[in-house]
């Protein structure tokens, strides 16, 4: 399998050099070329044929937004990962980029750390590998592999074939009680999530009987804009969760970046609790924290869904949801950008059914109505 070719687009020579070092140090990646703005990047596209693009937002002559608009206009389908500032205005522009077709984003370290990309180098490397490999496979240009996703984790410095998941444990967990009716839907998702959730929520039925609570791994300052962007395309209300928000049908609550989201059933209603405790499974918000609270409060009356993402956050407690008697779904390998979280959940025996991204909204609508 050939190396993934990365086009680096940033007006800062220092940043181009730093990103280039990350690419050079990552087995399976190679620099296709570098460009100082969107206009030069467009001129290079046909010649260098990148598999993935790293794009800065603020550049002279043609900025990141203008570059993405031009890609869309010319129907050029190359995955783009945005390098975004953490400033509030950066969050709005980043969400605009996702709406224009960017695949994902990563935040630059701020202030005195702005020139130190080592804090995000591993995440950036894995994103570029995942999106670049997927592009190679979908275009059929450099790979004969039939798997669309990038399987987590790496276990050596040599890029592994993207193998299928291990079979489920022979001794699967046993539900402690029969499935009850579904009263809440909980979704955990990470890398590949922004576009996946856009696709799913655009097709959710407006009369879905259950509320939805979501953890999407995302830094502080971005989840509010992310929720607003989803709200534009979803028939249901989508908002960033605030402490005390009612959990009710017709509403989707997104965990705020940098905080955990848990659910709490009271005598007359269920409410969201936003808590500021330590990261769990390496994340904050954590899917495991949300799923654990849903398992505790709803037992066998939930639908848990674990989707594309690196690592294993959510795998442990979606298995707990399953043993409590709730129904569970995992995104399948073929449609996951990174088959990490859903793979571990499947191998642990915590997932009843694997569903493709294209069929996920229909599955949610079907489960929600059939088992209301």
Curated annotation (Swiss-Prot):
Annotated GO biological process: chemotaxis
- Region (Disordered), start-end ranges: 140-177
Keyword NAD set for record: no
Name all Response regulatory domain ranges: 5-123
What's its catalytic activity?
Answer: [protein]-L-glutamate 5-O-methyl ester + H2O = L-glutamyl-[protein] + methanol + H(+); L-glutaminyl-[protein] + H2O = L-glutamyl-[protein] + NH4(+)
Matching SMART domains, A to Z?
A: REC
- The biased composition feature labelled Polar residues covers 140-151
| Keyword annotations from UniProtKB, A to Z | Chemotaxis, Cytoplasm, Hydrolase, Phosphoprotein
Residues bearing PTM 4-aspartylphosphate: 56
Q: Where in the cell is it found?
A: Cytoplasm
Provide the E.C. number(s) assigned to this enzyme. Answer: 3.1.1.61, 3.5.1.44
Q: What HAMAP family does the annotation carry?
A: CheB_chemtxs
Q: What is the role of the protein in this entry?
A: Involved in chemotaxis. Part of a chemotaxis signal transduction system that modulates chemotaxis in response to various stimuli. Catalyzes the demethylation of specific methylglutamate residues introduced into the chemoreceptors (methyl-accepting chemotaxis proteins or MCP) by CheR. Also mediates the irreversible deamidation of specific glutamine residues to glutamic acid.
Question: Which named protein is this?
Answer: Protein-glutamate methylesterase/protein-glutamine glutaminase
- Provenance organism: Treponema denticola (strain ATCC 35405 / DSM 14222 / CIP 103919 / JCM 8153 / KCTC 15104)
């Amino acid at each position: 399998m050939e190396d993934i070719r990365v086009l680096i687009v940033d007006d800062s020579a220092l940043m181009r050099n730093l990103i280039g070092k990350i690419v050079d140090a990552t087995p399976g990646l190679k620099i296709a070329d570098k460009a100082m703005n969107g206009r030069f990047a467009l001129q290079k596209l046909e010649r260098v044929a990148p598999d993935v693009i790293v794009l800065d937002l603020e550049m002279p002559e043609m900025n990141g937004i203008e570059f993405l608009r031009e890609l869309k206009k010319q129907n050029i389908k190359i995955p783009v990962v945005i390098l975004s500032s953490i400033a509030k205005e950066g969050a709005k522009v980043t969400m605009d980029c996702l709406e224009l077709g960017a695949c994902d984003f990563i935040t630059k370290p701020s202030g005195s750390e702005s020139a130190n990309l080592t804090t995000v180098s591993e995440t950036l490397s894995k994103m570029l590998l995942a999106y670049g490999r997927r592009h190679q496979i979908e275009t059929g240009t450099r790979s004969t592999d039939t798997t669309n996703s990038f399987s987590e984790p790496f276990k050596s410095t040599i890029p592994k074939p993207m193998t299928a998941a291990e079979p489920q444990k022979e001794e699967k967990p046993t539900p402690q009680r029969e499935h009850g009716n579904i009263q809440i839907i909980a979704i955990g998702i990470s890398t590949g999530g922004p576009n996946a959730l856009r696709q799913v929520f655009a097709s959710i039925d407006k009369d879905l009987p259950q509320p939805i609570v979501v953890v999407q791994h995302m830094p502080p300052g971005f989840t509010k804009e992310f929720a607003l962007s989803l709200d534009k395309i979803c028939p249901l209300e989508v908002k960033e969760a605030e402490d005390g928000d009612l959990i009710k049908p017709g509403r989707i609550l997104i965990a705020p970046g940098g905080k955990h989201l848990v659910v709490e059933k009271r005598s007359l209603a269920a409410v969201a609790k936003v808590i500021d405790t330590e990261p769990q499974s390496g994340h904050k918000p954590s899917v495991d924290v949300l799923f654990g609270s849903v398992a505790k409060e709803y037992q066998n009356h939930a639908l848990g869904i674990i989707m594309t993402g690196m690592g294993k956050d959510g795998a442990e407690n979606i298995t707990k949801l399953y043993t409590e008697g709730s129904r569970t779904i995992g995104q399948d390998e073929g449609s996951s950008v990174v088959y990490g979280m859903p793979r571990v959940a499947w191998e642990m025996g915590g997932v009843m059914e694997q569903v493709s991204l294209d069929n996920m909204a229909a599955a949610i609508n079907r489960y929600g109505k059939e088992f209301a």
